[in-house]
Amino acid sequence: DAFKCVIEWLTGDRAAYTDRTSNIAIKADWSNGNVAMTGRSYGGTTDFAVASTGVKGLKTIVPVAGIASWYEYTNSQGIATGGVAYSDNLAFYCAGRYINTGLYQNDTEWDPIKETYPAYLNRIYNDQIALNGDYGTHWATRDYTAGNEGKAGTASTSTYNNFNCPALIVHGLNDTNVRTKQFQLMYNSFKNAGQNVKLILHQGQHITPDYDSHKTSLLIDGESYNGILNKWFSHYLYNQNNGAENMAAVTVQNNTDGSWTTLSDWDGNTETLRLACGDDGKTTVNSNYSYADYGHFLDNTDSTAARAIYTMDVDTDTVIVGTTKVHVKATPIQHLTQQAAVASDENTRAVAPRGVNHEEAMNSLKRANNDDSDIAVMSADSGSRDALMMSAMLIDMSDTPFSTEALDDWGYFIEEETGAVNWVGSGAEDYAVIKYQQTETNYKVIAQGWMDLANPGAGFDSDSASAVKKVELQDGKYYDYTLYLQPTHYTVKAGHKLALVLFTYDPNMASYSENYGYTFQNAETYAEIPVNSFYTLNYSAGANGTVTADKENGAQMEANSLVTLTATADSGYDFSGWTVNGEAVEGGATKTFTINGNTTITANFTVHHSSSGGGSSSGSSTTVSASKSDNGSVSIDKTSASKGSTVTVTVKAKDGYKLDKLTITDAKGKTVDVTDKGNGKYTFTMPEGKVTVTPTFVADNGSQTENKSYSDVKTGDWYADAVKYVSDKGLMSGTGSDKFAPSATTTRAMLMTVLARC
């Protein structure tokens, strides 16, 4: 709320004062009332949180590695992935007066609450312990994807009705601090709200591309990140017409060579690969392994008692885009007798609320006093355990070593300066342009996922992991699970293998002192992997011009990726249009195309005709163009033609519409005769001069409304013709199967319906 209040002050909707006592108001008279927010990590989180309120004056946000849902930061599909309790620790660290008590002695603001605040921390600690990794009210109030509805204490309903500003979302595809699902949740929120939303996805970890504290710069497709911000903010805060709002929906860095690809959509993958786990039989995995054992999980492709691994060959370069779904039909092996003592002890401790002395808990010398152990039981008398982790990994494997990012001893990517600098100006220190040091490996983890065996109904949305949906597990009973791996964009090279690894707990996320496991049915366990194929791009210029592009001719391009071409006519000629795979398409001399198949693009040119003088010379070609329509499309077999030649027009109406008429006019506005050849094809003979093709589409209401008669409308009635007209056109359909009710009053709603059908 504090950030929201500042925005309200900047827009003139809230009063502010010079201090707490003088009652002297101060206005932000220097503000134009247009506000943007940006920041990384917690700063990116607050951007998204404030946007979820729909506050007036917030024109755009640029969250970097931000959190959309605090539940997803430390939990996944009903299981805790970083300790059951965390929110209280964050609240402690955000309370400067609590941490630095010596600086705030006799503080009139802090003194009244300094005894109450620890109780608040313990309350939210106990709320998390009670949920034990499940989604509930505690997390709903910290789930910004739900907007104000979530803050009211209810579970998210995915209405997204509070987001009313554009967003440029920035995230590292190798960020394991704030996992990649967070950018997907943000993207969904803005997209479902109908807002202009863009993604910049780099191969880094938890960083800002222009990293001020490091004085380093990871260029975004050759452009500085701060330069992109400058254009974005200039457009949305100062109404500069610089085209920033038209940047690609997705700008993503490739894992193979560090190059960049632009995509028309994040969710536009074209195919799904199925990685199967066998045709029959059952497989069992257990948790009887150590952290050291886990470090050797991927040394080979042989399944063990600790993990099952399945592979498939990759024959062509393939891009994984989005969220892989791993379907598992499994039954738990709980070893309930081993848990009896722990369960009984848990019931005893549950008599009084658990608590933590946060000042001691946060002191590294006193951490032993922090009673923060995970709970792995429901209760002693339930006969069922809770919080049993099921884990999955998707792996890129190759017999031949391939390049990946090198890590230092702390697990961070090692930066290398390229020798180039990003000039900052104003006497500030320039940023060194960097890339990531590479090393050789035979495997790399592409994506991971975790869920609770006791939450088989948990899905991608956080609230699907609600505690009320938890089940009491029964050994021998099979449950259907879907693990959602973290979203990614990753290219697997031809000749590699994709491997799916299934196991129990991830030692980086949880620890279990007691053994458990699960058995799954092989035939009903598999991964659905969303992928984009690669296609060949070819482009050329017809006679009398040239064409340039931001991609190489003959390039292999990922499905849904974008290429921008510019056509330049030779002297004495004009650009006359584009042809894509032999079909004419609309567009100016500079046009961006989406690639979804092998594509050949040709730029066409015609002789330039002066506006004065004696007309075109015999045999020269002139332009054929088509007017755009929202309810259908027109393609022309040639975009320029000479007088007397035959031009073929193909018309295709959208679903629910049909062609009403096709009008072709010459340069003087005279109608040109058209021949209907059937199947949506029409021809005409090219006249002298430029020709324009204009289709008109109308709603196709089928035969249901045609020639319909009504028992209360007689042929001689004065309104009979009007009733027939609106009925035949599908504008009105009466009040029943054979009644029109011509004397009824027409309401505003009815009028709006008629207008919508026009």
Model-identified regions with their sequence ranges:
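Short beta-strand/loop motif that positions the catalytic acidic residue
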Residues: 169-171, 175
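Conserved alpha/beta-hydrolase "acid-adjacent" motif
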Residues: 176-182
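Conserved "repeat-terminator" motif of extracellular CCP/Sushi domains
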Residues: 535-539, 589-610, 619-626, 676-702, ...
